[in-house]
A protein has these predicted regions:
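Acidic catalytic/metal-coordinating carboxylates
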Residues: 42, 73-76
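Active-site residues of response regulator receiver
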Residues: 66
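Hydrophobic/aromatic residues positioned on beta-strands within the core alpha/beta folds
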Residues: 92-94
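The feature encodes the CheY-like receiver
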Residues: 70
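Short amphipathic alpha-helix used as the core "switch/output" element in two-component signaling
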Residues: 75-87
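Two-component/phosphorelay signaling modules centered on CheY-like receiver
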Residues: 21-39
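Non-catalytic signal-transmission and effector/linker regions of two-component phosphorelay proteins
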Residues: 1-15, 21, 51, 120-132
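Acidic, metal-coordinating helix/loop segments flanking the phosphotransfer/catalytic sites
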Residues: 41-62
Length: 132
């Protein structure tokens, strides 16, 4: 019994930033099987939540970040978080990013991986496991 409590306390934390509610709920249901999940639906909320958790000493281990959010682009969010000694970021998009943008994001280590929608749920679990 004690080890299971320890396992729960030591679960990794994954944040999902997705402005489409159905996808946000779907991704979180899959990831909640293995991780503690924080759901946000805008770039501003993502940055705010990251800063709040960091200030409380409750770091987020991985961020799944949609590229095209209602209030800003995912690459801008990724850059801001990485400049604050950020976390590992997986960028997700229904759009194929142009090569110069992808190259900049990878070369400057703003993101660890890029996933193109539609994404299979087992792919999300696999990518999360590889990243953290």
């Amino acid at each position: 019994m004690q080890s299971s409590n320890s396992d729960i306390r030591n679960r990794k934390v994954v944040m999902i930033c997705e402005d489409e509610q159905e996808l946000l709920d779907l991704y979180s249901r899959v990831l909640e099987l293995k991780y503690d999940v924080i759901k946000v639906c805008s770039g501003a909320e993502c940055i705010h939540e990251y800063l709040e958790k960091k200030a409380k000493g409750s770091p987020i281990d991985l961020l799944f970040l949609d590229y095209k959010l209602g209030d800003m682009l995912g690459d801008d969010v990724a850059k801001k978080i990485k400049k604050m000694n950020g976390i590992k970021i997986i960028l997700i998009s229904a759009y194929n990013l142009d090569e110069p943008t992808k190259k900049e994001l990878f070369e400057n280590k703003y993101i660890e991986k890029f996933l193109q929608k539609p994404i299979r749920m087992r792919q999300i679990i696999q990518v999360a496991g590889e990243a953290i």
